[in-house]
Amino acid sequence: MQRGAALCLRLWLCLGLLDGLVSGYSMTPPTLNITEESHVIDTGDSLSISCRGQHPLEWAWPGAQEAPATGDKDSEDTGVVRDCEGTDARPYCKVLLLHEVHANDTGSYVCYYKYIKARIEGTTAASSYVFVRDFEQPFINKPDTLLVNRKDAMWVPCLVSIPGLNVTLRSQSSVLWPDGQEVVWDDRRGMLVSTPLLHDALYLQCETTWGDQDFLSNPFLVHITGNELYDIQLLPRKSLELLVGEKLVLNCTVWAEFNSGVTFDWDYPGKQAERGKWVPERRSQQTHTELSSILTIHNVSQHDLGSYVCKANNGIQRFRESTEVIVHENPFISVEWLKGPILEATAGDELVKLPVKLAAYPPPEFQWYKDGKALSGRHSPHALVLKEVTEASTGTYTLALWNSAAGLRRNISLELVVNVPPQIHEKEASSPSIYSRHSRQALTCTAYGVPLPLSIQWHWRPWTPCKMFAQRSLRRRQQQDLMPQCRDWRAVTTQDAVNPIESLDTWTEFVEGKNKTVSKLVIQNANVSAMYKCVVSNKVGQDERLIYFYVTTIPDGFTIESKPSEELLEGQPVLLSCQADSYKYEHLRWYRLNLSTLHDAHGNPLLLDCKNVHLFATPLAASLEEVAPGARHATLSLSIPRVAPEHEGHYVCEVQDRRSHDKHCHKKYLSVQALEAPRLTQNLTDLLVNVSDSLEMQCLVAGAHAPSIVWYKDERLLEEKSGVDLADSNQKLSIQRVREEDAGRYLCSVCNAKGCVNSSASVAVEGSEDKGSMEIVILVGTGVIAVFFWVLLLLIFCNMRRPAHADIKTGYLSIIMDPGEVPLEEQCEYLSYDASQWEFPRERLHLGRVLGYGAFGKVVEASAFGIHKGSSCDTVAVKMLKEGATASEHRALMSELKILIHIGNHLNVVNLLGACTKPQGPLMVIVEFCKYGNLSNFLRAKRDAFSPCAEKSPEQRGRFRAMVELARLDRRRPGSSDRVLFARFSKTEGGARRASPDQEAEDLWLSPLTMEDLVCYSFQVARGMEFLASRKCIHRDLAARNILLSESDVVKICDFGLARDIYKDPDYVRKGSARLPLKWMAPESIFDKVYTTQSDVWSFGVLLWEIFSLGASPYPGVQINEEFCQRLRDGTRMRAPELATPAIRRIMLNCWSGDPKARPAFSELVEILGDLLQGRGLQEEEEVCMAPRSSQSSEEGSFSQVSTMALHIAQADAEDSPPSLQRHSLAARYYNWVSFPGCLARGAETRGSSRMKTFEEFPMTPTTYKGSVDNQTDSGMVLASEEFEQIESRHRQESGFSCKGPGQNVAVTRAHPDSQGRRRRPERGARGGQVFYNSEYGELSEPSEEDHCSPSARVTFFTDNSY
């Protein structure tokens, strides 16, 4: 195929070269052995003509239209063409042989170069005209129709076989003789006749005489035609597509002058093979003639594809029209993007096209969709046209194409991004035009656009006029807004001297469902009028808001003042001042409302409008104060020298807006109180007072005007002094510690302008002053002593209740603390927040999609610009509150921030990166982002990709070993290598996070999941929990859902308390009003509400079960109810997953020890798992893979895989395990037999072995359960508060054993349900062991100090087979 294509290419180049030579006339023509132009032979003779040339040759003669393509072809009708011997100058030679020629062989014999298209006489061809004389048939033409038009002359083709004859032309009415002018004879072409001579002829014949005999040629029927062709059309106009086997029909139509004649000819690929036929048609119209030729080919094939040319000729004009015919073997649909998958437009565009490159046959059905919804209307499959593009036009547009008959379907999607010019929303609402002097003002611009503008620029200029110009309105089409054209704008800075700037902040805020850019300029002190503008722009436009910041000394620019301002009394002078700023208002007027106009005829109050206040009020004469030079306000004063009751009423000041000419008014009501004489409401009475007692006398008065009150004693003016007080406008007289000289006559005198009134009384004093002084001393001393003791008791109580500062700070390091002991708010008071280190600018944080919602918070993916040194943009997770969060929720998130700061950074903990705490926006806590989500979902998704024997790359193994080595180095040198470990892996992780997808070293979704990965995840979780334990932090909810997976196989412990909706999480069970993860909780946490690091170790064992079951839900098929809690406390445990090796099973069982003290510490777990990850067990992995153990049966398909971790890994690890784990080691093969810690008795630890019974042997009460193991819900698992109270009550009342002495070992059993559902007590030693319960963590009872025991515990496994 390739060789043939190369050969064709060379041939094409050669032909092109030859064509070029021909066009330049530089080619040597072929030569004939007959040199004369005409050669004459007789009928029956043989003809032999040889031709030589420089290139391959071919012959053409009257007996054949074309020479054979290759080789020789013998035929008596067509003659014989043979090769002959050439010469050096002309190596190619062809000879043409004709035997027994006859008259019809008369004609032109042409020799030409075979591979050159152009036949040019004397250049690429040579010819000779041969006459074959037949004296019995001198004329050789056939009957034909001769089309005669209005041209000057035309040929009558009377061809002869004998040259030199005398020929005349005869019609039905005349004979024409050649005269060399109007009638000319040519032996080769016939008779050339002037057209006007033929208009009356019906037919024409040529006549000659040879010897004594006359000969006539075949007649030519004369048809007089028009000679103008108007147009030609080939239908279908466009290229025609067909399938193999279909019919091709082409219609070539010519519009010509009336009664015109046209000769049609077709050129197409199948013409030589005589495929198809064309049929002429003629339709005469009133003004013209339509002539058609219809080409039809049945059952088209691949050979019929190509160019089809229709040629029309009337002898004067030649028309040509062509089309392409494409033949397909099978139906097909091909669609591609024409301009790429993402197209951009601008809001407001009148027309936008979404084009695609479509090739299909037959034409398919199609439908356009936008964001999954079908679009109505008529559309084209080649382009979707959108009119009046808006922001709502943004979306994904999908073109669906289908051919139901052929079963073909194709889809293509295009993303349209509509860019929106920025708009400032404050322009839509009216803003104040006047601002009070010395006030604090905030100017705000809220902008929205696509793309979102990231910044808003502020400018200012002095208060001077600006020119106005017209600009197209962005909000009202076909309208224009008048915009001021101002110059001399300056950038606003915080050091602006005109009006002091307090702050200038810009941030992104989620408003009305959109992210908008908000900028606030706070002016600390408005002193000077100025013009401000905010400018916002993006790549498709710009918008600006002009703010006229006019500063005035008059509040709101218009006010009324009254002097005096308090209640008016009859006779006082009153001054009403109406002040208005001259910049905004003019035409000040005073009115007094008529009382009759305030109510209608029915007494209902009228609503008065400032626009027509003059209709309801009486104008008043007032004086306009003179305005000082430079002042911008006017004051219209209304003065009343002596106010009287008739002046009481409503006074209105009316002003007019300078620009809008609207009327504005303020109303002031004057209330006038008439004067009246004072009167006493209570007279003074005589009093008898003891020495040192208190004395109080009241002179209560009434009157319209506050009168003056004066006190006299024994007709002398009484004034205030030490021990004598006058209060309540002198109406009350008080004397403290009365003495003998205070006795006498007291007079109260009350006066005003209308008159005076008096009242008097006598005061008598009895007793001795010495006795009174002693009583005072005793009372004061008693009070001082009582206060002293009260303060002392208060200090003692506070010291007992509040621990020392250091104790509180140390204890708070445990994040999960009982709030009943120390409230969370009080704990956080001792943790600081360093804004200089952790505060991150809001404008460099771009919020993205929501990762999770909670009851009152959410976690959002975001892009932080410059949060790490040396990086431009990092993906982070942002914890924030929902809208409408309460103050307590805000304090809770702030507490979490302080706790994260205090804990510090660690590789295997989700670390704090920064925070946004400033009041300009919501509180946001920025933490690391883990791209692979939580470990539980990741393991489930990777089950199909689990390949236990897959080889890890040297880089991955090196990374695993580095984790272990650095962890051990950290343990030997605390506080040093931890930072090295975090820095090393966080740098790798951060580099992967910031690298492009093409540069990312590894994608965990593409790589297989191996046993090494599971051990590595377990090791890292233990490492992170070891760090939290060292910081005295108790997690309390350690589970695979709270473990996140990041780049480079790094896992991180998290607890997104705000993001997790525990009320919907099926892993949680409600306890009263709270929800508890009972499947992960240790028995002491369930029954005693005790949370310690050892209870986290229990949860770590459940987490191991999740990891090695590839994300399954713990306790599959088990109903979480009261019986579950009892069985868990009694020693029943889960059965290990089949992927767990003996070493992993042993770790699980030790983590599930009923005695918290017997559980391993996280430091021990780090050492053991580190040995498994790095030790010799993994080095022998290849040997293990060749001898896999048989898998356990499980309903879950992914659990039936063959475990490839070696059994001897566990045995090898057991040799290096700490003693605390070795003495509970599990036999390699019999993983249903365990040695489990029992109870402690007086510090002595006794352990024994007993056979473990699986859950299949002793199942729980049957329950109906539906659902998968992975998504096991806790429907019906909610334990009400009453149920927990019953459990706790039993756990206090039931004394499961009675230990009477150190030497006695008493068996204690608990009832188990029998086959009928009744509870029975197991016999001693049943099923291979006795049941004992630990007094502190097992039975949940309260034994006396004498109680002690030393039993062995029997432990039952929950197995997934029970499901």
Swiss-Prot record:
Consequence of substituting residue 1068 to F: Global loss of autophosphorylation. Abolishes stimulation of cell proliferation and cell migration
Effect of residue 1337 to F: Reduced autophosphorylation. Strongly reduces stimulation of cell proliferation and cell migration
Entry comment describing in which tissues the protein is expressed: Detected in endothelial cells (at protein level). Widely expressed. Detected in fetal spleen, lung and brain. Detected in adult liver, muscle, thymus, placenta, lung, testis, ovary, prostate, heart, and kidney.
Cysteine-cysteine disulfides: 51-111, 158-206, 252-310, 445-534, 466-486, 578-653, 699-751
EC code(s) of this entry: 2.7.10.1
PTM entry text: Autophosphorylated on tyrosine residues upon ligand binding. Autophosphorylation occurs in trans, i.e. one subunit of the dimeric receptor phosphorylates tyrosine residues on the other subunit. Phosphorylation in response to H(2)O(2) is mediated by a process that requires SRC and PRKCD activity. Phosphorylation at Tyr-1068 is required for autophosphorylation at additional tyrosine residues. Phosphorylation at Tyr-1063 and Tyr-1337 is important for interaction with CRK and subsequent activation of MAPK8.
Binding site for ATP: 851-859, 879
Effect after changing residue 446 to E: Decreases autophosphorylation on tyrosine residues upon ligand binding. Abolishes autophosphorylation on tyrosine residues upon ligand binding
Known catalytic reactions: L-tyrosyl-[protein] + ATP = O-phospho-L-tyrosyl-[protein] + ADP + H(+)
Sequence segments annotated as region (Disordered): 1291-1331
Domain note: The first and second Ig-like C2-type (immunoglobulin-like) domains are sufficient for VEGFC binding. The fourth and fifth Ig-like C2-type domains are sufficient for homodimerization. The fifth and seventh Ig-like C2-type domains are required for autophosphorylation and further activation.
Subunit structure: Interacts with VEGFC and VEGFD. Monomer in the absence of bound VEGFC or VEGFD. Homodimer in the presence of bound VEGFC or VEGFD. Can also form a heterodimer with KDR. Interacts with PTPN14; the interaction is enhanced by stimulation with VEGFC. Interacts with CRK, GRB2, PTK2/FAK1, SHC1, PIK3R1 and PTPN11/SHP-2. Identified in a complex with SRC and ITGB1.
Illness: Lymphatic malformation 1: A form of primary lymphedema, a disease characterized by swelling of body parts due to developmental anomalies and functional defects of the lymphatic system. Patients with lymphedema may suffer from recurrent local infections. LMPHM1 is an autosomal dominant form with variable expression and severity. Onset is usually at birth or in early childhood but can occur later. Affected individuals manifest lymphedema, predominantly in the lower limbs, and hypoplasia of lymphatic vessels. Additional features are hemangioma and nail dysplasia or papillomatosis.
Name recorded for this polypeptide: Vascular endothelial growth factor receptor 3
Taxonomic classification: Eukaryota, Metazoa, Chordata, Craniata, Vertebrata
Gene: FLT4
